[in-house]
Amino acid sequence: MSKKAPAQKKLPRAAAWYEIDMQKGVFRFKNKLCPKCGSVMAFHREPVPRWHCGKCGFTQFQR
């Protein structure tokens, strides 16, 4: 029997988190930061569009 190598985790690329402007040399964060605790907020579409902080539980609903 051959043993399988453990699966390696793929790390997210920086391009997924940042908008990069090569002409100006600027990196801008794509997601919002939580106004309460300062961590990164996630955008959820279902059941209603909203930004949610997983750390402190703050939720901001879209209009």
UniProtKB/Swiss-Prot annotation:
Protein keywords: Metal-binding, Ribonucleoprotein, Ribosomal protein, Zinc, Zinc-finger
Binding site for Zn(2+): C34, C37, C53, C56
Positions annotated as zinc finger (C4-type): 34-56
SMART domains: Ribosomal_S27 (SM01402)
Superkingdom field: Archaea
Cofactor: how and how many bound: Binds 1 zinc ion per subunit.
Pfam families: Ribosomal_S27
Biological process (GO), any one: translation
Keyword hit for Phosphoprotein: no
SUPFAM superfamilies xref list: Zn-binding ribosomal proteins (SSF57829)
Listed InterPro entries: Ribosomal_eS31, Ribosomal_eS31_arc, Ribosomal_zn-bd
Required cofactor names: Zn(2+)
Cellular compartments per GO CC: ribonucleoprotein complex; ribosome
GO molecular function: structural constituent of ribosome; zinc ion binding
Record HAMAP family: Ribosomal_eS31
Protein family according to the UniProt entry: Belongs to the eukaryotic ribosomal protein eS31 family.
Quaternary context: Part of the 30S ribosomal subunit.
Name of protein: Small ribosomal subunit protein eS31
Organism of provenance: Pyrobaculum neutrophilum (strain DSM 2338 / JCM 9278 / NBRC 100436 / V24Sta) (Thermoproteus neutrophilus)
